[in-house]
Structure formats: C-alpha cells, structure tokens
Amino acid sequence: MSKLSLFGLFGLVIRRDLLLAMRRRADVLTTLVFFVMVVSLFPLGVGPEMDMLRKMAPGVVWVAALLASMLSLGRMFSADYLDGTLEQMLLAPQSLSMLVLGKIVAHWMLSGLPLVLIAPVLGLQFDMPAQALWVLILVLLLGTPILSMIGAIGAALTLGLRGGGVLVSLLVLPLCIPVLIFGTGAVEAVNTGMTIVPHVALLGALLLLALVFTPWVTAQALRISME
C-alpha cells in the first residue's frame, strides 16, 4: 500500500468497492427499488389531484431519497470491518481521511447516483414541469452526496454495535434536515416562479463544508470504533 500514491489509493478504494458491490447487486437494487416504491405510492394514494401532486412532489422525492440512503449506510464499513480491511486502512501510511472519502464516493455512486437518474422519471407521475425536473436533478446531485457524507459519520460511530442500523438513523436524520429543506425549497421556488439561487447556493455551501470536514470526522470515528 505504501508504494501507491494518495490519489492512486483513493481510486483503488472506489474501484474495489464498486467491484464488490457488483457481486452483491441485490443490495444495490434494494435501495433503488425502495425509492421507486415509496415515491410511486403517493400518486396512487392521493389520486389524480394534479395540483396537490405537484405541491407534494419535491418533499416526497427528497424524503424517499433520504430514507433510501439510510438503507445502505450500515454496509459502508461493515464488510471491511469483518474481513480486516479496515484495520489495514487504519495502519496505511496514507491519509485515512482520503481513503474514507473514496468509500463515501463509491457509496454515493451506488446509492445516490441511481436515485438522481431515476428521479425525473418518477417526477412525471406528479405532473412536474420540465423546468422543475431539471432543478430536481440539480439539487439531488448537490444534496445526495451530503447525505452519504453525513451518513458515513453515523456508520462509523455505530460500527460493530448491535442495532446499529437504528442508531445510524437516529444520528443521521436530524443532521440531514437542512439538506431536505433547501432541496425541496429549490423545486418549490421553480413552481412558484421564484429564484432558486439561494437554495442552490446554500446546498453548494453545505456540500463544500461536508467535503472538507466529514472525511476527517469519519476517520476519527473509525479510530474510536476500532479501539
């Protein structure tokens, strides 16, 4: 591991996690199927009230994305913890924060990116206009990585604990509320003819802050959990 550059190891962590995920495709599909089912149930329950569906759409999609992301958080570090890979990462001469960031990126590519791609199709069920769909894609691209980064902290803190999945949700959900507010606010702003700039700017700022701080915090949480 010491012969690899920092960014080379970062890419290796991403490729490794993606390859392992392809061997467990059911885990990846579970998140996507859950997201599709939750979003699709609302139009069936509400009925053909298009005005109501358009108003509900941003909140429904974001809440479903948040809950779907919770499903896969427990798997972010558990396999590496069980097979000893995590111990090797802790002992590696390279920055643990960078290795953690690689795992977060891989987690987002497997759980967040598919939601971003399928969300516009699901938005058609709510009769969302084209402009609102584009904004939905934009805010999901900004917001879902934040969910993965915040979730990584919770996953690291509850690593190896019984009932860790429930604890992760209790830790992570309150921290994700700002993302939920700004993400839904941007789409609602389009529907009401207002500017989306403040919402998008705040989401971008949250993304940058999370990118700077969460890998380091997650790395420290992993060290504590492994002691």
Feature-to-residue mapping (PLM):
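Aromatic- and glycine-rich beta-strand/loop motifs that create alpha-glucan
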Residues: 1-31
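Membrane-interfacial helix-loop-helix connectors in multipass membrane proteins
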Residues: 45-56, 120-141, 159, 186-202, ...
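Hydrophobic alpha-helical transmembrane segments that constitute the membrane-spanning cores
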Residues: 101-126, 146, 150, 183-184
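A structural motif at transmembrane helix-loop-helix junctions in multipass membrane proteins
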Residues: 134, 139-173, 223-227
